[in-house]
Each structure stands twice: as structure tokens, then as C-alpha cells.
Amino acid sequence: MNDAVTLRSGCKVNLDLHITSRRDDGYHEIDSLFLPLEEPHDELVVTVGDAPGITVTCAIQGIDPTRNTVTRAYDAYAEASGFRPPLRVELRKGVPHGAGLGGGSANAAAILNHLESIAPHPLGRETLCRLAARIGADVPFFIHAVPCRASGIGEIITPVAWPYKGFTLLLACPQVQVSTAWAYGALDAAEEKQLRVRGCLTTGGVADRNSFSRESWLHNSFEPVVFASHPELRSLKEALLRHGAAAALMSGSGASVFALFRRREDAEAAFEQLKGHGIRVYQHLL
């Protein structure tokens, strides 16, 4: 591998996110429906390094070059396989930090998949997903990068049917950052009756947890605690619904909010208004 290899690393939204329990080892068990998105995206430019190990550089401040999801993924793979190729990685960030889009998790999955593709003795998908779960709950999903249900601590992945063809998904990324660690801490500290408030978006109930139901009540366990500290995110969600969205929900631990529109023209109108307020907005035709 003498030439640079550019790995494209996308993001995700959670169309349903239940934090079901906190385990004794500190990990949280989840039950979530994931949808991969191509935009926004990061790029990892990989070249051969000078010595076994990995060196990561990034122009964005706040990313520790020695301890990040990419280095953790490399270390986990090397420990499990004994394969330690010399790599240099330039991380070009396009996914907003603290937005609940899983940018760091996608970076980890990208390097795991890359190592698996060049290793003389690949570990196999099952082992790779177990390694991924140790890095973060979203990482196993990005190993697959298809619409799926994730349970356990994120390592149990089940691909699902997707009935929203023809909808437009609008993703809004305000100038707000929410720490995932803070959100989990706030969730743990909240009383059960305070945090189990449903993020009501459409009508009906989730009859089949292995599919995305058009009549589902989309839910995010983080919304009550995050909205309490960042009421502007609640206002953003309400604004999307006023623009005719069939559904709107915060993704992950925030701060991004997405909406599903049946009518493309409603999505276009919301897109233009949010752009006018300085919010990063992305459109996806599903």
C-alpha cells in the first residue's frame, strides 16, 4: 500500500432509540433503529507510516491525536489479531462534533473495515463487531452500514426492511454540541418517570421492532434530559413539524434533529428557512 487510500466515513440517525438499562460494567444496553446517511461525511486519508503503529492527524482542534476512536480501533484490532501495519491517517472532518450523528464511531468502523481488508488473517465479521462494540455502541452498526436494529450494547445487529421510500429526510445541525458522556450521565441521574417520555411524532405503535413502521411512534430516550438543558433543540424540532414534517426527532444524544417529509416541497421550504438562520442542513431522498 504505497499510495494513499481515502476512506469515506458517513453518519447515521436513530429513528428510534431506547436506553433500556445500565449494566454493572458501566455499559448501557440499547434498542435502536439506525439509518445510515452519506452526508455529512468525514474522510480518512491512509498512507504507509514509518514504523508499526498508527499516527493520526486532524486540523480540527479538540481531537487528541493519540487517543481517539481511530487509534482505539487500531489498537483493538492489533491486540486481537497481532496485525500492526504502519499507518498514517489524516482525518478530514465534515460530520459535526457533538451532533449525535456517530461521526467518531463511523471513523472507527472505517479503520476496522480497512484493517480487516488488508490483514493476512482476517478476524471475520462476528469478531469484528465484538471489537467494535468495545469502542462505542454505534460502531458495530457502521461495520454493516445498512438500515438495522441494534440491541445489547450495540453489538447485536439485525438488518431491517425500509418502507420510507420516497420520503425526504431533512437533517438539521445547529451550532450546539452535546457530550454523549454528559447525556448518559444526565439520563442515569433522571428519575424513571421523568425520562421515559415518548418523543411522539406519528401515530400508532411499533408493532414490529425489526422493521421501520410508517405508523411508529419514534422515540429517543435522550430527548427529555437534553431538551431540558438545550430548549433551542426542542424549538428546532417543533419548527420542523410546523413546516409539515410527518415526523421529527433528535438523533442520538443530540444535538442534530432530523425530520421526515412526505412532500418534497415542504422539505425544500424548511431547508431554505433553516439555512437562512445559519443552521447546517442536509437533504436526503429516501
Swiss-Prot record:
Its EC number is 2.7.1.148. InterPro entries: GHMP_kinase_C_dom, GHMP_kinase_C_sf, GHMP_kinase_N_dom, IspE, Ribosomal_Su5_D2-typ_SF, Ribsml_uS5_D2-typ_fold_subgr. Gene3D superfamilies: 3.30.230.10, GHMP kinase, C-terminal domain (3.30.70.890). It catalyses: 4-CDP-2-C-methyl-D-erythritol + ATP = 4-CDP-2-C-methyl-D-erythritol 2-phosphate + ADP + H(+). Pfam families: GHMP_kinases_C, GHMP_kinases_N. Pathway: Isoprenoid biosynthesis; isopentenyl diphosphate biosynthesis via DXP pathway; isopentenyl diphosphate from 1-deoxy-D-xylulose 5-phosphate: step 3/6. It comes from the Bacteria. The keyword Nucleotide-binding applies. Disulfide bonds: none annotated. Keywords: ATP-binding, Isoprene biosynthesis, Kinase, Nucleotide-binding, Transferase. GO terms for biological process: isopentenyl diphosphate biosynthetic process, methylerythritol 4-phosphate pathway; terpenoid biosynthetic process. ATP binds at P96, H97, G98, A99, G100, L101, G102, G103, G104, S105, A106. The keyword Calcium does not apply. One of its GO terms (molecular function) is 4-(cytidine 5'-diphospho)-2-C-methyl-D-erythritol kinase activity. It is an enzyme of class 2 (transferase). The active site is at K12, D138. Belongs to the GHMP kinase family. IspE subfamily. HAMAP family: IspE (MF_00061). Catalyzes the phosphorylation of the position 2 hydroxy group of 4-diphosphocytidyl-2C-methyl-D-erythritol. This is 4-diphosphocytidyl-2-C-methyl-D-erythritol kinase.
